[in-house]
Structures are given as structure tokens and as C-alpha cells.
Amino acid sequence: MKHPLLTGLLASAMLSCALPAFAGQAPFAASTPDIPLSSRDRVYAAEQFSNTISVTNPATNTLVGVIRLGEPQPVNFSPLYKGQVLVHGMGFSPDRKTIAVVSIGSNSVTFIDTATNAVKHTTYVGRSPHEAFFTPDGKEVWVTVRGEDYVAVLDGTTYEEKTRIKVPNGPGMQIFSPDGKYGYVCSSFMPETVVISVADHMIVGHVKQESPFCPNIAATPDGKQVWFTLKDIGKTQVFNARPPFEIIKTLDTGPITNHVNFAHNANGTFAYVTIGGLNQVKVFRTDDFSQVATIPVGNLPHGIWPSGDGSRIYVGLENADALAGIDTLTNKVVATIPIGQAPQAVTYVPGAVPEGDGTQNLQPLGVAGQSAHLTLRQDGAKGEGKAPTSVSLFDQGLIQILQASVTGLAPKKPYVLALASEADGKGKLEPLSAFMTNPAGSAIVNAAGPIRQIVQNDAKAQRRYLVIAEGSSAQPGAVVQRQTSD
């Protein structure tokens, strides 16, 4: 005697065992099958001061090479220079065949074939674009033009601009709901995120940001939540991805909160947030928002992206010229890979190289990996609990670009980064860059010059020491942080 119900249940169970697991990693939907990590995958990082894209094989955690989109200083000062400047933002197509790379200084989006690493097209948009991403159907590419007040909408095939969506001033980043219905655009200049209908490009929702500086936004694969970071006040906010788009949670994450992304594994779905001022990645559950881990990763973590199966998450270390790989089950760093200068956005593209070794059109790291690193601490002490100010000196020929991830100062106060004639900060100060701290008492500070030769000079009479002093360039006050030997 046959039992139709039992037979059906057994058939269903066997079928479910034969299918791949449906877990869904960002930016795809939760219903999308996981893609096991393999040597066909690539991790890309946009490197702001070497003007390169590093290409890493996650199966071996080794750098395959770099795609050079531009030259360092002083070559890019020429009025005849045609390369890209400040390579910064990045997204990829849903078929995983194309990455879109944003260069802030040259107002461009460069489209690169993942199989060959060849540039397919370059589109020039408005002033200081920040990020780009394809709609889930691949028909459009949205580019946040942060130096203005609109999103440039490009055709997903020709890459030409077809329309603009007016948004609050300074759009920081965009991401889409996994079903492709909504685009979420936060602002870096105004305290407002907008929700846009992808079908007709109309704004259908408004979300109040606790501060005006949002650099990054991400949507959970289940389509229920949107998380965005607030770099100036060190917070991360979560809102309902569906109408009425209300705020669900605000988390105090830490100074220089940079990017957020998600990984789903056997333990659940987790948000990973890079905290640049603490040199950490913090991990939160998305169901109850509890913090489950704090991961030390290295200097100034910035961009972050999960593997296609959620087993790993990769982090760009802006002031360490490196890529950190994290095992998401143990929440431990399992690899640190040297890459180019000051990595910003990071993307992980499963199956980016369908055949071959994927080394076409790549160059060795070379000068893109040359930099020096220093530390500044309060009163020259080792200090416990607070991360020190990290300083990177990125080689640009005979000079360097200095970038300091400054932490531990009073909020909303003027300071100056300077050179002191004595190691204890006494004597004459030579100002390099004046800055104002944000509400979290932190700042990103830049300068340029032959600084490495000065602060590492073996001749005592010519050597100078990096310090941070209160006040302005015209009237520097007391020294509050000094260069240390560690």
C-alpha cells in the first residue's frame, strides 16, 4: 500500500538536501544560494593615494596584483594628466562581471571587466562622486555625487548618464533593497537619508540622521533593515527597510565609525562595523542588536565586505596599507594581506574569474605599497584602553602624503598637527595642518611634504617630531600628543 503523503514528504526532504543552502549574503537577497569561497573569487580594494585597485585571491589570501587607474603625485599635478585621482568608491554588477570604481578627484566612474581586469569604459559625472552601485536587475548604475545634490543614474549597459535624481545636499552612498524596489541614499552634509522608488526615481521616504555625516549604508539580505554609519559622532543607526521607514535602533559604535556590512552563517545574521578611531571591527546581531564581538584588526579599518558564503569578511586597513580577512564563525583575523595605499571601499565578488588565472592587465604592487607608519600618544605615554593616533606617510616620489587618524581629543575644538624641534614637544612648532575635531573628539588630518625624511632623520640637528597642539597654526598652544617610538 502506498502512502502519498509520506512519499511526498520524503521526496521533498531529498530535494531540499540536493539544493544549495539559501542564506543570502549582502548585497543579494536572503533567498539567493550561498556561493562557496573559491580561487575564482576576488576581493577588490580602492586605494586612494596610489590610485590603484588591489586584486586579492581569498582562497590563498594573496595579492594577485593591482589595476593602476592613475599615477601618484607629482605626476597627477600636470595639466595634461588624464589618469584618475583619489580612487575611492566601488560597486559591482549583479552578474559579477563588472566592477564600478569611483575616483573622487577626477569625477569619474571606471568600469572594469572582472575576468580580464581591463577597463571597459570611463564615465565622467559631477563634482566629487563618492560611491556607485548597480541596481539588482543590473539595468542602472546609481552614483552619489557628493560634491553636489544629486544621484547620477547611468545606463547599466552603455554606462552613459541618462537622468539625475535630486536629493539632499552631499549624498554619501546608495544601496538597494534586495528585491530592487527601493534605493536608500544617505547624506554626508545634511542630517537626512531618503528612500527612492527605483521604478520611477521618486522620493518616497525620509529618515532623520542623528548627524549630517553619513559615509556608508547597507541593507540586510532579508530586506527588513537598513544600517548607516555616522562618522562624525561615532554612531550607527538602523531603520525599517519598508514603509514607514522608521528608526529602529541607534548604536554608539565609536570614533570614526566608517562602514557597515553583513554576514550570515550558522549562528545567524551579523552586522560588522569598522571603527577607524579604535582600530576595531564591532559585531552586532541583527535580531536583537546585541554586540557579540570586538575584533582588533589594525590601523584605521574602513571598507568591509563578506564572501559569497558568509564564512569570511574582508576589511581594508586605511592606515596600514593592508586587507584583513576575518573568519565569521570565530570572529578572529585569519589573514593580513599587503595592498596599496589607503584602501577605502572594499568589495568581494564571487566567481569574478570564471576561467584562467585572472592575472591579465595586473601590475605588481611596487611603489603603491611604499609607506611609513608612526604613532602619537598623549603625554608620550603608552596608554591603555584608548587607541593611539595612527599616522601613515604614503610615498609619492620624494614627498609623502601624511594621513593621521586622530583620536582621544576634546570634541569640537581647534588643534594643529605640527613638527616640534624636541621629542618632548618643547621648542618651536612648525605647523603642518590645522583641524577641528568632530563631536567624538576625532579627525582625519592630511598634509604633504618630505615628512618621513624629517621625522626619521638620523641627524639630531635636522630631526623633527610630530605633535598635536591645541589652538591654530597662527597661535599653537599646549602640546597634547607626541610622536612615540612604538
Regions found by a protein language model. Give the residues of each.
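Short, aromatic- and glycine-rich surface loops/edge beta-strands on solvent-exposed regions
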Residues: 457-471
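Predominantly soluble domains enriched in secretory-pathway, periplasmic, or organellar proteins
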Residues: 13-386, 397, 427-431, 436-440, ...
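Bacterial N-terminal signal peptides that target proteins for export
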Residues: 1-9
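Short, flexible loop/turn segments at beta-strand junctions in immunoglobulin-like
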Residues: 406-409
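Short beta-strand segments enriched for Tyr within beta-sheet-rich domains
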Residues: 413-419
